């Protein structure tokens, strides 16, 4: 069995900082995680909800902050409740934010059972 280590310090920490982080701190954290062989670094959300830049995880912004090669896969999270239209998950909205050319390789999805039935 293969194990992967995922770090969600920034995504989870955003609840305390409204997803605003100092770019130098982010670069130092990512370099440290990468040097310690963390497999996946979850940077924040891709969300239409108001919040700092790590609540949006815009590819251009992330690329400007992380201007160096990272071995780990970069990830973001979406919350299904942000993509519900007429009481149904709007899959086209989700597909629009997941681009093959993205700096992100992984999208994690947070959902409650009743949101995805």
Predicted regions and their residues:
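N-terminal small/glycine-rich loop or linker at the start of catalytic domains
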Residues: 1-18, 71-73, 101-102
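Short amphipathic alpha-helices and their capping/turn segments at secondary-structure boundaries
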Residues: 28-34, 63-66
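Basic, gly/Ser/Thr/Pro-rich low-complexity segments located predominantly at protein N termini
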Residues: 18-19, 49
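N-terminal glycine-rich anion-binding loops that anchor highly charged ligand groups
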Residues: 2-8, 30-45
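Active-site beta->alpha loop and helix N-cap motifs at the rims of alpha/beta catalytic domains
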Residues: 40, 45-117
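Conserved, mostly hydrophobic/aromatic
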Residues: 13, 33, 107
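Anaerobic metallocofactor- and corrinoid-dependent redox/one-carbon enzyme cores
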Residues: 23-27
């Amino acid at each position: 069995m293969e194990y992967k280590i995922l770090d969600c310090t920034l995504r989870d920490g955003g609840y305390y900082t409204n997803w605003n982080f100092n770019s130098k701190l982010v670069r130092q954290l990512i370099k440290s995680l990468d040097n310690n062989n963390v497999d996946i670094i979850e940077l924040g959300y891709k969300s239409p909800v108001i919040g700092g830049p790590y609540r949006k995880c815009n590819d251009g912004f992330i690329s400007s902050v992380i201007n160096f090669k990272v071995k780990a896969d970069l990830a973001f999270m979406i919350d299904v409740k942000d993509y519900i239209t007429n009481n149904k998950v709007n899959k086209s909205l989700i597909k629009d934010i997941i681009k093959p050319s993205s700096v992100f390789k992984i999208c994690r999805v947070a959902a409650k059972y009743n949101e995805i039935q």
